[in-house]
Amino acid sequence: MKKILLVFGTRPEAVKMCPLVQELRARREIKTVVCVTGQHREMLDQILATFSVVPDYDLSVMKDSQTLFDVTTGVLEGIKGVLEAEKPDIVLVQGDTTTAFAAALAAYYLRIPVGHVEAGLRTRDIYSPYPEEFNRQAVSIVSRYNFAPTEQAKENLLAEGRDPGTIHVTGNTVIDALKTTVRADYTHPELAWAAGKRLILITAHRRENLGEPMRHMFRAIRRVLDEHDDVRAIYPIHRNPAVRETAAEVFGGDERIHIIEPLDVLDFHNFLARSYLVLTDSGGIQEEAPSLGKPVLVMRDTTERPEGVAAGTLRLVGTREETIYESFTELLDNAAAYEKMSHTANPYGDGRACRRIADILAGE
């Protein structure tokens, strides 16, 4: 029986790995072991509960005001004992987090094969996003299995000289997650507050946007909200104190926006399904929103998901106040522009990525 250890520690990782945990645990020929690092503690626990995933190991590395040094050393030191005790045949990591980087590095040190879920995303700038672009490139170097979500991701890996035999195009596992979480009968008091209005969903927390860039982003959003009485915004805010301070400074007193605590994945996906459009500097939502027909304004200068830009469902607007203001206003005031972005083919898969990954791992 093949033993597979899945390691993850943040909310985005959990959303994309929990459906894979469920798929692998349904396979008799695979023993599935789950280790969470707790890089994002409370938000991680929400996802685990939603998917009824109980981890076998919890490293609990999160601490107040943690740095990249803290997370990297905490995961490296904690995962070593798990790897030595379990002796897995394969270690699976997801995406581009510090957890993924450190766990893959630890597996490499012990000569354990690494599988990388969502491999091949690239901006080619290791400081944008930071540190995610470096993390995912580093994981690819040590991976024996590269599960690329799209053909473009595969081409990125081939361009770097990766062995074609290690690359498998599977689609993105977040689409699998949406099949579980989005529900027709869902209700929530915040959605009732926005009933009859066009709902804008905001997510913003990116490390490189902290400070003045985020202030510009928020000012643009507030200007648009002040000019459109039929629009309401909901911002499930990140726990980073720097994000909260800037949001309070810019949005304070504006009755058209509700700043709420982070949502669990079931709530978030259902808010997303009922939104009019999304403004974000996040990565994963660039995949989730197109699957639900929602236009996305990406408040970043680069994206590792060019498929959405090419398909027309994502638009890069950077962090300049005027650019965000103009694009946001256009989608609210120009019905043709909105329709063009909201009716595009989803480039990120068909909801069967987990099955494909499990088939590959079981067949090796």
Model-derived regions, located:
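Nucleotide-activated sugar donor-binding and catalytic core shared by glycosyltransferases
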Residues: 1-235, 242-364
